[in-house]
């Protein structure tokens, strides 16, 4: 036990003595350092020579001093110039902290911390698009060796640049100066880190951070993790025209954050969070558009199969409309079994703001831009799927599918206009299909009909084909419910890319259990104005048992009569007709109405005019050449009272009112009537009446 005590006491004494010796040596080391470092100024010329030899270029030091801090000497040089000529590097101050222990082990100079102050460099763009660095000395005729540069950087453990300035000089654009540039670089054999901060010309700070794993012998396998913080600045005034090309931006106020991960020579992952309070710009000479409160969160992932870009949140204000969507783009790389595929999917796309966006910012050909502007697409898409195969040579190169939500578009180049189209859509470049299930559906077959057709419910199946000659739209099944009744139909529309060829349409529409008040909506624009006006005002009401409309021919407004064929048929009962202003209405009419290229024919089996029954009425309004007046020819039988006949003679606009004024009569009246009534105003009708009376009584006003 005593022996152990003595050993512990001896170890304690030796330990305390050793600590005291270390403290004495450290104090001596610090004291000698404090005494000797100021003498460094006397070796300024030697240091210049040594540094010039190491750098391979001249180095001049205006003032050199040394001091001590902690356990390390500090060398402070002012007014330092490296190199010569226009590219000489001038520094206000250089502060170096040598690593004495590492220098002794490596038997060459090692710097623990090198601090540069007042660095001023510039990047200038040449006419060929290359950038040249000015303000840094270079060794002529010596190409850049990355491995040699990396090995030299290992001499400095930490490099700091403070209070510096970088000037960017793009071609044909005012220079841009970045001030208060500060960076800190920590080097290592396998890991490096760079942190930088600078101030933009508007005074906003920008921050960068890079963490790398670089090995000079395996540069391709290097890893870079980067981060950037961008302030809310107006970037439009700093972007050169060569970068924006034909886009003209008057304001790009945006900021955000960016994360990247680069490995094995490619981008492995990235994330961006962007917030742009206001963007204003246009493509070429188009009208500018303003986008407010743009918010974007996007992610990028790379794998062996392909890449994925996810827009987790994409939203903006376009005018008074808030546009939001979530979009994902997936790339499948080509293999021996699978061709390259780009797949896009979106939960919802509001189409209404897209039209002004494409009109203002879309780099579209003039023809496509005109079509987008004329169509004015509205509504939305849900569950959008797009497939793009870059190497495909057939129609499968581009495929799509989506659910339509109240989509609408205007008529353009013979294609019909529609509103509130809902259903499912799928297809590719060769063709596709639309299955429609819509409420409050609107269809406008322009230019055949002046006004659109409105329906309560519509169900249809439409297919289309696209070839090198034109576009074909086919509706083999169309069923709608409107205020006029139940309607079914089909149509075919062919639009040619060559405008010298005639676009045409085949349309058939059938109506059952209809209302005669709405039959005027199916009157085509090609009818003469007088006939069109008569048909729209003559049928006041009635029940349509059956109706049929057919159009075959050209879609051009300037097409001739021989280029189209029109037929319209209605089978009605309990109808009321006002066939001419001033004449009493004919009610309880049952018969058929034919509207054809040759004219209009009405075959009424029965009806009632006042209290007189009419039967076997035939109305004919033949088609006349342009410039001639349209006439209505009426032939029919009647059976009623003499009083009704006198009332017609007194009130009808046939020029007999004064003659039969004041006449009164009673009794039975039967006969036949023929009328020739011009539909143009200002002409007198012609009347031929063959009648007989029975048990009649007639009272004349002036016998």
Q: Where are each of the predicted segments found?
A:
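Strand-loop-strand
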Residues: 198, 295-314, 434-448, 452-480, ...
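Terminal hydrophobic membrane-targeting helix
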Residues: 26-128, 206-209, 213-221, 251, ...
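Solvent-exposed loop/turn tips at the surfaces of repeat/solenoid architectures
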Residues: 64, 80, 94, 114, ...
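Extracellular/lumenal and peripheral-membrane lipid-interaction modules
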Residues: 3, 8, 12-18, 22-64, ...
């Amino acid at each position: 036990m005593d022996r152990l005590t003595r050993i512990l006491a001896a170890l304690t004494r030796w330990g305390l003595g050793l600590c005291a010796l270390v403290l004495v040596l450290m104090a001596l080391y610090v004291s000698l350092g404090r005494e000797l470092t100021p003498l460094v100024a006397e070796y300024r010329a030697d240091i210049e020579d040594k540094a010039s030899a190491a750098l391979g270029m001249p180095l001049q030091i205006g003032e050199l001093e040394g001091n001590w801090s902690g356990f390390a000497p500090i060398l402070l040089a002012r007014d330092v110039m490296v190199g010569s000529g226009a590219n000489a590097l001038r520094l206000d101050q250089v502060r170096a902290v040598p690593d004495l222990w590492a220098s002794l082990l490596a038997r060459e100079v090692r710097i623990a911390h090198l601090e540069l102050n007042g660095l001023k460099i510039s990047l200038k763009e040449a006419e060929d698009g290359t950038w040249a660095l000015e303000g840094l000395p270079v060794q002529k005729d010596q190409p850049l060796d990355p491995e040699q540069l990396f090995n030299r950087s290992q001499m400095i453990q930490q490099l700091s640049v403070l209070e510096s300035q970088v000037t960017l000089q793009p071609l044909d654009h005012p220079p841009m100066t970045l001030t208060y540039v500060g960076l800190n670089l920590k080097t290592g054999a396998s890991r490096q880190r760079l942190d930088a901060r600078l101030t933009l010309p508007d005074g906003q700070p920008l921050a960068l951070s890079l963490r790398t794993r670089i090995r000079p012998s395996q540069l391709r396998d290097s890893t870079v993790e980067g981060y950037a913080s961008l302030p809310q600045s107006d970037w439009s005034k700093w972007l050169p025209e060569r970068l924006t090309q034909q886009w003209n931006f008057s304001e790009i106020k945006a900021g955000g954050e960016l994360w990247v991960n680069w490995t094995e020579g490619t981008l492995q992952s990235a994330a961006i969070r962007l917030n742009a309070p206001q963007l204003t710009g246009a493509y070429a000479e188009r009208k500018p558009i303003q986008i407010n409160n743009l918010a974007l969160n996007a992610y990028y992932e790379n794998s062996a199969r392909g890449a994925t870009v996810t827009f987790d949140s994409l939203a903006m204000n376009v005018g008074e409309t808030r546009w939001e969507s979530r979009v994902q783009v997936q790339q499948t790389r080509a293999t021996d079994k699978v061709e390259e595929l780009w797949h896009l999917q979106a939960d919802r796309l509001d189409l209404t703001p897209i039209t002004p966006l494409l009109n203002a910012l879309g780099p579209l050909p003039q023809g496509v831009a005109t079509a987008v502007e004329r169509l004015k697409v509205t509504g939305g898409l849900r569950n959008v799927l797009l497939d793009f195969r870059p190497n495909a040579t057939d129609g499968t190169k581009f495929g799509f599918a989506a659910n339509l939500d109240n989509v609408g578009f205007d008529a353009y180049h013979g294609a019909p206009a529609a509103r509130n189209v809902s259903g499912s859509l799928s297809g590719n470049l060769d063709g596709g299909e639309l299955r429609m299930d819509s409420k409050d559906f609107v269809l406008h077959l322009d230019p055949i009909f002046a006004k659109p057709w409105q329906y309560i419910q519509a169900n249809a199946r439409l297919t289309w084909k696209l070839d090198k000659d034109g576009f074909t739209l086919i509706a083999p099944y169309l069923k709608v419910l409107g205020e006029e009744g139940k309607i079914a139909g089909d149509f075919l529309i062919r639009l040619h890319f060559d405008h010298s060829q005639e676009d045409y349409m085949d349309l058939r529409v059938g109506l059952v259990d209809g209302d005669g008040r709405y039959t005027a909506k199916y009157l085509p624009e090609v009818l003469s104005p007088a006939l069109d006006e008569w048909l729209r005002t003559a049928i006041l009401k009635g029940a349509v048992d059956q109706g049929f409309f057919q159009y075959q021919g050209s879609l051009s407004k300037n097409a001739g009569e021989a280029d189209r064929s029109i037929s319209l048929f209605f089978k009605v009962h309990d109808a009321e007709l006002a066939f001419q202003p001033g004449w009493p209405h004919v009610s309880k009419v049952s018969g058929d109405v034919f509207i054809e290229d040759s004219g209009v024919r009405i075959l009424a089996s029965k009806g009632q005019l006042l209290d007189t029954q009419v039967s076997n009425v035939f109305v004919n309004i033949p088609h006349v050449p342009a410039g001639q007046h349209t006439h209505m020819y009426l032939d029919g039988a009647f059976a009623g009272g003499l009083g009704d006949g006198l009332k017609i003679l007194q009130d009808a606009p046939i020029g007999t009112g004064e003659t039969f004024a004041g006449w009164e009569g009673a009794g039975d009246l039967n006969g036949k009537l023929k009328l020739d009534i011009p539909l143009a105003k200002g002409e007198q009708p012609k009347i031929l009446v063959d009648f007989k009376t029975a048990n009649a009584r007639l009272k004349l006003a002036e016998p």
